[in-house]
Each structure stands twice: as structure tokens, then as C-alpha cells.
Amino acid sequence: MEHKRLLKVRRRQKARKPEFRRYCWNKKLRLRNKSWRRPRGLFNKLRKRYGGKWSGRIPVNVGFGSPKAVRGLHPSGYEEVLVYNPADLEKIDKERQAVRIASCVGMKKRLAIEDKAKELGIKVLNPSG
């Protein structure tokens, strides 16, 4: 019950969280999709939090994280486990964990994994077709 409430809280927090863009992300194409890096320049206005660079931007700060109990979980509330073959399904706890089939697995083995998961009652996060 507590898990469901915390997942709702996390969803609300993520909706309000700003996009933390790296400094000069709009000037260099290679920085477009990169993750946040703290500005370390001696005269950097974003680091000093003043000037035109700072206005309207929020640097990464404490308080934007999700609740610790649900951090890293899939939005459905399950813990993701990467599976490569049907034998890996034996180690799965179906109440807490869900399966994601690895991208390097071929169609034949993927179908075998899905059949065995259905038989064991395990949720597959990326089923075929």
C-alpha cells in the first residue's frame, strides 16, 4: 500500500522537475542530449548563480530526488531484472520483480522466455508484438 502511494508521489515530483540542461547546451550539438555537468569555471555565472545565465534556470540541487523506497523501480512498481535465457526465470520473485528480455536475445529464445514467464506468472516488461 505504501509503495503505491510513493509511486504516485514520484510521478507527481517527476512532472514538476525541470529539465536540467548542461551549460552551453544550445551552442554545441554534442551537448544537446548529454546529462547535467556541474559548471566549474572560475568566472561561470551559472555556478555563481547571477547574471543572465542564471535567471530562469535551476541547477541540480538537493530536493529533486524521488522517495528512496521506490527509487529505481519501474513505473508499474516492479524491480526490473534483465533476462537472457529461460533458466534465468527460476531466480525471479514474481511479487517484487518483473522481467525485461535483453536486446541481444533472438526471436526463438525470446518466445521461449515469454512462454515460460506466462507459465510461472511473471510479468514481462517488453513482450514481442
UniProtKB/Swiss-Prot annotation:
Identification of the protein by name: Large ribosomal subunit protein eL32
Alphabetized SUPFAM superfamilies for the sequence: Ribosomal protein L32e
Coiled-coil stretches: none
One Pfam family matching this protein: Ribosomal_L32e
Record-level GO cellular component terms: cytosolic large ribosomal subunit
Organism superkingdom: Archaea
Sample GO molecular function, one term: structural constituent of ribosome
Glycoprotein in keyword set: no
InterPro entries cross-referenced by the UniProt entry: Ribosomal_eL32 (IPR001515), Ribosomal_eL32_arc (IPR023654), Ribosomal_eL32_CS (IPR018263), Ribosomal_eL32_sf (IPR036351)
Gene this chain is encoded by: rpl32e
Record carries keyword rRNA processing: no
Keyword vocabulary terms for this entry: Ribonucleoprotein, Ribosomal protein
Protein family per UniProt: Belongs to the eukaryotic ribosomal protein eL32 family.
GO biological process: translation
SMART domains listed in its UniProt record: Ribosomal_L32e (SM01393)
